[in-house]
Structures are given as structure tokens and as C-alpha cells.
């Protein structure tokens, strides 16, 4: 078959294979398996399983997708649906372990090694599906974006995850051939069922369809990014990071099942507890406190059929125990993928060459800091303070995804000390700088940071959030650790105070803030978790612990001991997603964002259950502490806008008048773009509102608005005000971390990101980005004093940012959360220096 004919066949096959079938998720499962292997270390036993799997990637990758092979109707009209269903549960793993131990004693030959690698891939799929389908991700996605419809989220999420994977991640590790241990699988199924339930031809045909689909996804699936981004902002924002069922959480659970599988392969199952749900397997005498449930993961099928033509079968190579699938010439570099990449490069060069250089663009940072550890999430959160009391600002950076071999996502915090020149003006690998390291498996230490004097000894202390502590028990309670400062300017090497939460899925420490909560003029510790139950489901919790000199060393506190605590008002409203403290007329005002608030009370009065105008409006609450009743409320007015995702405040001149302002981000707000006489909707382009904080007014008055200029850019998802030119006014800094450079928003390019800096002297009333000299609106660049552009494509430049002040200069540090400069998706920090000239 020619490359063109096969390419056409793949385009036809993809929608048939994926539409409304839970057999999709091939790219997602392959990516999970790849990440799980990165930090795998199984110390006990006679076999180096990591080396074995690395040697047999062809079998391992095929195994990560295999359990879904027989679900879709395209596979023999769905006749073997039950075979796929049974492959997802512990009895299949148990049968496989016994089969290998009975038939293939150590040392193993190569075919048996491939069988073992294939089995490891299957176990990854098992536990990943449970987190994705049954426990966490899709259920929350349904609640947030699909009116509590799990089935709608399921339909969009399975294939949408593949679209997002292909758009955001580089699959250059994908093996060009796969191996399926056909003979061994047939015998395992015979043992599992006690009879013959499937034939060799069915097994080969249906797994080969998976192989073709996986490589078909590599060609064109990423071009559907805009479709699935529009359907579900939650999918785009939480796909990798969500605490229960996000990619990294599924990779963590894969490493757990690998440890158990290796133990059973070498020692048998007699010392193991094997419930039907593989998440609850244990071989150490301990079991999880949660009870497992078996939920059938497939609900949708079509009566479709397809056969594999004879001329495609020439890419199958049978062996005594299995079959190899290969791509042939159609997937080589000169294929469609290569043509897409070449077209993208040429268009980028053409656009760059034809456009006049913008004088306000800053494309080169003064320094960049990286890590050589993949998936570290460097710069997930940052703060600055003079920790060593030398008069210079220091930079504190969280990397909650940092891992060691055998210690997945324990997390780290890095401290970079400033001097007369500010932060070090050279590129750094931060592993050589000051470090605090987490100690709980997948605890994600470093997810939140706050600097305050918690024990009031005159020295700055550091609070660090680890919201996924307890993930190994499926409780995700979370913890906050406080490290006391010392006279030597260094922090304690171990936490002096630990604050914990007893509620399942509490996620304590997701956000931290230092602000004066009791009116004594000293900062106190504010802790929030938008995912905490709050009495029901993800209402969110915000709590405050006052700083005082009676704080003891090695103190253990619980959330119930908080001095001040407030819950969200609606399920899945994510109260506490953002926090900001500000002083207004000598009173402490705590602002709390609830971006997925949807006005349930008004929805209940509506005659339409699915009122499109009520979803994720967002809301901001303002509390004059220590009052527990909100005095200020600001509500969103646009469905899916998520007002309150970000908050910041400062002083600027508005039409020449000095004004204390509050900025509120709505990064998934839709806007209208005008291009000459044409108009189009900028879905999730993002907007920011600027309000006046006036002591004589009960509610803040809206002054100005800012809007992004690209679809899906999330303009305003990060906000910051700081005085960069020492004129007594704050500059307004806004980030659009998902901004795609080309106007097609997904057909070419990736999530590059961009940061805009507006001079605080020149803000005006009304639409700041709508009055444009150019032929296109909005125009966020025109009024900006500086536009920081990403030095790396597809890096989510602007995922977080912070300002650092020293005696000699003011600096802005911008994180690129998906940078691969140091290692794959490890993150990077870029430093920009500004003077008062």
C-alpha cells in the first residue's frame, strides 16, 4: 500500500476508532508509561526491571494501551468487549503472574522478557484508568465543565487527552515497532476464563488497529486542539497536574503497581492481598483504608466494522510466541509529520521576516535558571524576600514535581540569594543552589510558598505547601511545613512546624499567603485548598494561623486548630484558588478567588437545567479580617470566564489620579476580536478587570479592562503589581502563558506564552486594550511599555512570575513551566532586569 493510501485510511480510521469509545487515550497511556519509567527504581530482587523495560520498549508501549484493544466496535463489532473489561482488573494480573512463574523460570529468555515488559505496561494502564475514570479526573471535569455529566466528560476527555498530549508533548520516544506476545496472551486468557474466549486473529487484528491509531494520532490529532480546548478548559489546565488522575498522578500510581508486580513475579502472590481493584493490592501486610469499587469503564459503542487489508499486513512479522508491528515507510521523517514541522518552521520565519520589529519587545533575558531533572515543574510558584537579611531580595522557587529514582514527585524548594547586582547574572543549574527537599512520596512539596516571621523572633521563616501528602493512601490530605530562620541567615534543614488536615482530598497547602490577619501589624499564615471538601465536594477552605512568639519547635498543628476558617459556598467552586492580602484604610483585607463558582441558586430557579450562562462565572470574596463575613463580592458575568483565578493590587495613576487598585483575572473569558471589518470570538483569550479600592466605597468600582489577543491564551492568569522604575507607582504585569504565536491558535505552533508590562503612570479608564492603532483589536501590546517574549517555543512562558528588589536594580523573574531547556518539561526561570532610567 502506498503512503498516501495508508494515510487516507488512517484519517478515516481515527474517528471510527475513537468516537465515543473509551478505547481512546492511547497517547495518554503511552505518555504515562514513559513518565513512570523515568524514575523507576526497584531495589529488591534479582532483576533490573527498569533495564528490562528500556530494552523492550516495543512490548512495553504496546502493553500500556492493550487493555482497551477489544472495546471499540471497529474491533469485530465489539464482540470481545468483556475481554477488554476483564483485562483491567486484578484477576488478569494474578493469572499473568501465575502463568509466567509456572512456565518461565529464571533466568528469562528474550521472549519472556518481552512478555514481562508487556505486562508492566498493562499494569500502568490498569491503575491509570481507575484514577482517570472512576476516582478523580473525569468526574471533576464533568462537574466543572459539563453540568455534572460524567458521560459527556468521558466522551470529550478520553480522546481530548490524546489531542492535548500530541499538542503539548514530544513523542520522539515512540517506538516505530510494537510487539504483542500473542501466544502467551491466549494462554493467559484460557486460564483466566477456564475456556477459549478469543482467537489469534482477533487479538492480532485489534492490537494492530491500536498500533495504526497511535501512529495516526502522531500525524494530525494535535490539530484538533482548538476543538477540545473550547469544550473543556479544565482538561487543558489540569491534564498534567490535577492531584487525582492527572498525568503525573497516574504515573505515580504506575510506579506503585510496578513495585508490587516485580515483587509478585519473583516471590509469588501468597503474601499479597489481591482485591479486584488493582489500586488496593498490597504485599506488605497493609492495605488502603478506602474501599475499592469496580466500575465498568466503557459505556459507548457504535456498530461499525473494518478489516485490515492484506497489503497492510506486510508490516506484521510473526515469531514463535508473538508478533511485531512496524510502521513501514509511511512514518519516516519524510512523512506528513515532517512536512507539518517544515511548514511550521517556514511560516514562523516568514512571519518574523515580514513583520517590523516591535521596539517594546524584550526577547532575551539577562539570565536563565534550569534543572536537569524532567517534569520538575520548576517555577510552579515563586516568592521573594530578604531571607538572609543582607538588604538584597532573594528568590524562593518551588519545584513540586522534582523526583529522585524511586522517589517520585517528592518536590523541592530552591533559594537563590541576591547581591548588589541582584540575582546571579549567569545561567545556573539550580541543583547547585540552596535546597529544601520534600520527604513524602508524591507529596509535591513546593507547591506553595510564603515568607513570614511565624514565631516572631525577628527572623524570616518559610512556609512550604505539600498538598498531595497522603497520595499513597489515596487520601491526598496535604501538609504545610514551616522552616524557621536563623541568625546565620539560613533556614532550618527540617520543618519546625507541621500543619496537617484529616479530611480526604483536603489538599492542604495548595495556596499560601503571608498577610496581617489579626491587626497586630505582623504577617500571619493563610492557607487555602480549593479542592478541599468543605463539608461536601470541592467547596474549598481558607484558614489562618496567627504568628506569635509561643510557637514551639517541632510543633504539630491541625487545620481544626486554625484561628480563622471559612468554607466555600458551592460544590466545585474552588474557593481559595487564589489569595491576596492588602491594607485598605489601615484595615487588613483578605481577597479570596473562587473561579469555578457558578451561582447554583440562580441555576436552581432557571427553567433550563443546563443554563449556558451560569457555568464557571467566578467570584471574589473580600473579608476585612478578622470578620468571617465577606464585605466585598465581585461576580463574573461571562460563562466559563473564571473570574478570580488571579488577584493583585497596588498603586497606579488612572487618568492622572493616584489610585489604589485591585486587579482580578478572568483568563478563560471570551472576547470579540475585530480584524478590519471582520469579527471573531476569542474563546478563552482572557481578560483582566481593574477596580478601585476606595475606603469610602462598599464595593470596588470598575475602572478599566484588559483583554488578550489570541484564543486560548489565558491572558490575565498571572497578575503582579510592583514598582520597577522607582517612581512610587506600580507597574502592571500580566501574563498569557498559553498564548500561541500564530493567529490560527493551534494549527501551527504551541503554547509559547507572553508577558506584558504596563507603566503605572499611564493607565486610563475604560478598555485599555480596545483602542488600537493597528487594524486588529484587542491590542494588549500597544499600551504595554515592555512585552517579554518567550525564548523557547511551547514552554508556557509566564506560568508564574515574581519581582525581586535589590539595592542596585529591580528584576522580574518569569517561569516557563513547560520548558525543556534543562530536561524534558522540567521548567525554566528567566530573569529580566529593569532600571529607574
From Swiss-Prot:
A biological process (GO) of this protein is:
positive regulation of glucose metabolic process
Q: Which residues cross the membrane?
A: none
Alphabetical list of InterPro entries matching this protein: FG-GAP (IPR013517), Gprt_PLipase_D (IPR001028), Int_alpha_beta-p (IPR013519), Integrin_alpha_N (IPR028994), PLPC/GPLD1 (IPR029002)
Q: What is its EC number?
A: 3.1.4.50
Q: Which residues are glycosylated?
A: 94, 267, 287, 303, 317, 477, 496, 586, 599, 655
Signal peptide coordinates: 1-23
Q: Where in the cell is it found?
A: Secreted
Which SUPFAM superfamilies does this one have? Integrin alpha N-terminal domain
Principal cellular location given in the protein's record:
secreted
Q: Which GO cellular component terms, listed alphabetically, does the Swiss-Prot or TrEMBL entry include?
A: cytoplasm; extracellular matrix; extracellular region; extracellular space; high-density lipoprotein particle; intracellular membrane-bounded organelle
Write down a Pfam family by its short name.
FG-GAP
Q: Which SMART domains match?
A: Int_alpha (SM00191)
Q: Which Gene Ontology MF annotations are present?
A: glycosylphosphatidylinositol phospholipase D activity; sodium channel regulator activity
Q: Which PROSITE patterns match?
A: FG_GAP
Write out the entry's keywords from A to Z.
Glycoprotein, HDL, Hydrolase, Lipid metabolism, Repeat, Secreted, Signal
| Catalytic function, reaction form | a 6-(alpha-D-glucosaminyl)-1-(1,2-diacyl-sn-glycero-3-phospho)-1D-myo-inositol + H2O = 6-(alpha-D-glucosaminyl)-1D-myo-inositol + a 1,2-diacyl-sn-glycero-3-phosphate + H(+)
Q: Spans of the FG-GAP repeats?
A: 364-425, 431-492, 494-554, 561-619, 629-689, 701-767, 785-837
Q: In which tissues is it expressed?
A: Widely expressed.
Q: What class of enzyme is it?
A: hydrolase
Explain the purpose of this protein: This protein hydrolyzes the inositol phosphate linkage in proteins anchored by phosphatidylinositol glycans (GPI-anchor) thus releasing these proteins from the membrane.
Q: What is this protein called?
A: Phosphatidylinositol-glycan-specific phospholipase D
Gene source species: Mus musculus
Highest classification ranks of the organism: Eukaryota, Metazoa, Chordata, Craniata, Vertebrata
Q: Which gene encodes it?
A: Gpld1
Amino acid at each position: 500500500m502506498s503512503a498516501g493510501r495508508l494515510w487516507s485510511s488512517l484519517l478515516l480510521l481515527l474517528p471510527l476508532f475513537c468516537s465515543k469509545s473509551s478505547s481512546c487515550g492511547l497517547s495518554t497511556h503511552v505518555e504515562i508509561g514513559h513518565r513512570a519509567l523515568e524514575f523507576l527504581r526497584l531495589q529488591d530482587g534479582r532483576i533490573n526491571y527498569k533495564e528490562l523495560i528500556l530494552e523492550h520498549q516495543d512490548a512495553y508501549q504496546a502493553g500500556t494501551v492493550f487493555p482497551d484493544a477489544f472495546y471499540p466496535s471497529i474491533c469485530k463489532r465489539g464482540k470481545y468487549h468483556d475481554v477488554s473489561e476483564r483485562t483491567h482488573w486484578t484477576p488478569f494480573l494474578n493469572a499473568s503472574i501465575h502463568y509466567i512463574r509456572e512456565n518461565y523460570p529464571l533466568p528469562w529468555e528474550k521472549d519472556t522478557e518481552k512478555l514481562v515488559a508487556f505486562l508492566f505496561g498493562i499494569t500502568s494502564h490498569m491503575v491509570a484508568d481507575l484514577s482517570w475514570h472512576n476516582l478523580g479526573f473525569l468526574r471533576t471535569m464533568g462537574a466543572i465543565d459539563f453540568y455534572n455529566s460524567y458521560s459527556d466528560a468521558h466522551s470529550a476527555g478520553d480522546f481530548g487527552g490524546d489531542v492535548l498530549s500530541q499538542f503539548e508533548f514530544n513523542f520522539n520516544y515512540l517506538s516505530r515497532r510494537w510487539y504483542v506476545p500473542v501466544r502467551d496472551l491466549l494462554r493467559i486468557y484460557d486460564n483466566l476464563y477456564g475456556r477459549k474466549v478469543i482467537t489469534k486473529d482477533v487479538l492480532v487484528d485489534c492490537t494492530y488497529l491500536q498500533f495504526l491509531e497511535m501512529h495516526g494520532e502522531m500525524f494530525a490529532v494535535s490539530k484538533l486542539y482548538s476543538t477540545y480546548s473550547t469544550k473543556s478548559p479544565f482538561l487543558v489546565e489540569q491534564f498534567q497536574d490535577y492531584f487525582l488522575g492527572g498525568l503525573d498522578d497516574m504515573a505515580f500510581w504506575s510506579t506503585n503497581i510496578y513495585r508490587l508486580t516485580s515483587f509478585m513475579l519473583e516471590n509469588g502472590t501468597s503474601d499479597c492481598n489481591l482485591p479486584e481493584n488493582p489500586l488496593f493490592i498490597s504485599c506488605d501486610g497493609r492495605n488502603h483504608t478506602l474501599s475499592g469499587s469496580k466500575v465498568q469503564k466503557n459505556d459507548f459503542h457504535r456498530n461499525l466494522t473494518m478489516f485490515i487489508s492484506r497489503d497492510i499486513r506486510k508490516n506484521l512479522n510473526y515469531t514463535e510466541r508473538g508478533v511485531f508491528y512496524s510502521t513501514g515507510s509511511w512514518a519516516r521523517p519524510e512523512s506528513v509529520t515532517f512536512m507539518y514541522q517544515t511548514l511550521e518552521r517556514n511560516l514562523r520565519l516568514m512571519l518574523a521576516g515580514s513583520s517590523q520589529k516591535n521596539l517594546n519587545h524584550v526577547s532575551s533575558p539577562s539570565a536563565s535558571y534550569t534543572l536537569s531533572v524532567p517534569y520538575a515543574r520548576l517555577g510552579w510558584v515563586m516568592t521573594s524576600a530578604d531571607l538572609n537579611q543582607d538588604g538584597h531580595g532573594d528568590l524562593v522557587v518551588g519545584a513540586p514535581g522534582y523526583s529522585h529514582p524511586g522517589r517520585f514527585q517528592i518536590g523541592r524548594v530552591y533559594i537563590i540569594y541576591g547581591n548588589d547586582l541582584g540575582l546571579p547574572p549567569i545561567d545556573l543549574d539550580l541543583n547547585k543552589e540552596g535546597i529544601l527537599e520534600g520527604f513524602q512520596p508524591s507529596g509535591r512539596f513546593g507547591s506553595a510558598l510564603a515568607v513570614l516571621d511565624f514565631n516572631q523572633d525577628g527572623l524570616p521563616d518559610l512556609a512550604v505547601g505539600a498538598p498531595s501528602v497522603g497520595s499513597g493512601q489515596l487520601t491526598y490530605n496535604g501538609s504545610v511545613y514551616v522552616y524557621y530562620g536563623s541568625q546565620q541567615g539560613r533556614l532550618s534543614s527540617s520543618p519546625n512546624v507541621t500543619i496537617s488536615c484529616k479530611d480526604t482530598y483536603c489538599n492542604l497547602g495548595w495556596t499560601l499567603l503571608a498577610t496581617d490577619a489579626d491587626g497586630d501589624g505582623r504577617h500571619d499564615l493563610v492557607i487555602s485548598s480549593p479542592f478541599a471538601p468543605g463539608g461536601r465536594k470541592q467547596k474549598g477552605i481558607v484558614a489562618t494561623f496567627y504568628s506569635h512568639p509561643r510557637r514551639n519547635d517541632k510543633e504539630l498543628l491541625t487545620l481544626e486548630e486554625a484561628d480563622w476558617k471559612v468554607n466555600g459556598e458551592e460544590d466545585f467552586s474552588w474557593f481559595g484558588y487564589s489569595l491576596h492580602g492588602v491594607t485598605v484604610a489601615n484595615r487588613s483585607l483578605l481577597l479570596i478567588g473562587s473561579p469555578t463558582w457558578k451561582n447554583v441558586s440562580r441555576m436552581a430557579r432557571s427553567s433550563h437545567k443546563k443554563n449556558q450562562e451560569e457555568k464557571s462565572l467566578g467570584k471574589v470574596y473580600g473579608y476585612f479580617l478578622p470578620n468571617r463575613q465577606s464585605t466585598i463580592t465581585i461576580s463574573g458575568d461571562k460563562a466559563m470566564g473564571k473570574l478570580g483565578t488571579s488577584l493583585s493590587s497596588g498603586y497606579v495613576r488612572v487618568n492622572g489620579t493616584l489610585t489604589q487598585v485591585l486587579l482580578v483575572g478572568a483568563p478563560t473569558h471570551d472576547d470579540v476580536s475585530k480584524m478590519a471589518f471582520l469579527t471573531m470570538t476569542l474563546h478563552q483569550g482572557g481578560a483582566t478587570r481593574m477596580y478601585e479600592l476606595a475606603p469610602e466605597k462598599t464595593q470596588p468600582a470598575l475602572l478599566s479592562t484588559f483583554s488578550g489577543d489570541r484564543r486560548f491564551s489565558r491572558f490575565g492568569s498571572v497578575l503582579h503589581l510592583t514598582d520597577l522604575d522607582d517612581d512610587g507607582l506600580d507597574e502592571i504585569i500580566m501574563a498569557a502563558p498559553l498564548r500561541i504565536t500564530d493567529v490560527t491558535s493551534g494549527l501551527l505552533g504551541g503554547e509559547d506564552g507572553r508577558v506584558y508590562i504596563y507603566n503605572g503612570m499611564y493607565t486610563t479608564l475604560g478598555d485599555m486594550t480596545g483602542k488600537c492603532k493597528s487594524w486588529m483589536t484587542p491590542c494588549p501590546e500597544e499600551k504595554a511599555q515592555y512585552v517579554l517574549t518567550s525564548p523557547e517555543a511551547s514552554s508556557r512562558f509566564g506560568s508564574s512570575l515574581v519581582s525581586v528588589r535589590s539595592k542596585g536594580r529591580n528584576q522580574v523573574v518569569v517561569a516557563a513551566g513547560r520548558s525543556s531547556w534543562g530536561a524534558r518539561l522540567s521548567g525554566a526561570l528567566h530573569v529580566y532586569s529593569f532600571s529607574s532610567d
